């Protein structure tokens, strides 16, 4: 049997050897993309089936009311979704708002009047709204909520078609102070992404975060769902990356009309079982531009899971197998993907193209190779091209840039996937 002193010395030596040995490198682990803190919907969750379909992708919602049903409220509380009560007009119920906040103390915001410069909505002049505003401010202070301004659109109220004119007069009223307001709420239905982006800029003059609390392409009405998809992709790319936009809410997940009827903006199907529409799949899986995410390359990284891009005006589509892909990836465009690599294997690209297409692939900002993609049988049959590029293991940024031709881009992965 070893003497106690001998065992003690051996133990000390073992500790010293461990301390003095070279550090064994720890390989980075993949991290998922977090859901967007901005993304939300304007919708009354009446069907319980809708909740698990949308809640993984949204951080907030409102229904134009003072509260919401108990089933939705419980689901929101347990799935990190913020419900915002609203004072739609001057006839709101303080008691309902008060009770909801007391029962759900994580409530953070109160929304102001809805489209006061529209005669079929709240229908208030700036002076009329200002008369009622101190009550709203007092309620937010009592409940320790942040206040969001009245939600403005181009209007039908005589003399106040321009939302800026309405806001300027409202904020000039003696009962109103910008200091009481956390954010500016606006609505937009212009079908041009450029027009919408310029519209957002108009409201930056107030120096407050902007909440786009209703939007979709509706004026003019899009001719098909693909036009609505193109609009959605462009404006979500913009708002997710625009630091002045704090939140946005899609109008709306479901209406009483048919899913395949104009303006083609529904995210959820009717009937049973309820499912996401193709537009809903794009909305819920759209990039949150989470720079902390490194997705596992071995499992495949979807073309839609980029964290940076050149040109916000891209198009996403949904294949028959529900895979989301970039439609018509054109010369001059690029996408950046943050990936985690666990094995040294060649990079693969899944795609379709019927023209000669040339790409440049970068790893961590360094060009690795020019890739010539062979033509595929057609635009529906997906091909996998194995490159000669073997990215190092760990966390890296891969850029795919189109140099010539166009192609439909599905995903990147490596040869360990299938």
Where are these regions (language model features)?
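Bacterial N-terminal signal peptides that target proteins for export
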Residues: 1-9
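Bacterial Sec-dependent N-terminal signal peptides
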Residues: 17-35
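N-terminal carbohydrate-binding/catalytic regions of secreted carbohydrate-active enzymes
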Residues: 37-110
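Aromatic- and acid-rich polysaccharide-binding/catalytic face
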Residues: 63, 85, 114, 164-220, ...
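Aromatic-rich peripheral "rim/lid" segments of glycoside hydrolase catalytic domains that contact
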Residues: 82-84, 242, 251-300, 304
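Active-site groove signature of glycoside hydrolases
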Residues: 104-126, 147-158, 179-188, 212, ...
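Active-site clefts of carbohydrate-active enzymes
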Residues: 149, 154-159, 205-232, 250-269
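Extracytoplasmic
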Residues: 291-418
